């Protein structure tokens, strides 16, 4: 069982002994300890797994530091988040070498190569946490599913500066005219009225 105790959510995934992936679980959380115990209990119930059948639990993520050496009596192994991101990216992509982008509360770039230690290349604080914070401040909403529904009915060209707004030759540059050139570019002081 692998558990990522992140800044805003706890994610759990595991494989059955025959190699089949169990139904993963994603739980929003503010308290890492409560989150990990509740999420693991729910995960085992939803996947019809007994705690005795879990050999070990791999724990990673910022909140993983709050998890001890065992969880519900099962041994825990703490793993570097960037190593987890790198190995997981290679597994999912079926590549031997890749730059893996992990988009969570923030965003991290990790270089991974089979048989080698993964390397953190850098990152940004812009991620899901940014979207949640902006949604709360600007819209008074925290539920991203509602924000996503609103976004689907919106029109980016009313707020974003598009390639077509700055050049008619975007296609000559390999850019589609309807691509965003600058997020929120039409709502800045220097932008013309949209």
Q: Which positions does each model-derived feature cover?
A:
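Phosphate/pyrophosphate-binding loops at sites that engage ATP/ADP/AMP, CoA/4′-phosphopantetheine
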Residues: 40-55, 191-194
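Short beta-strand-to-turn element immediately C-terminal to the catalytic PLP-Schiff-base lysine
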Residues: 15-16, 110-113, 137
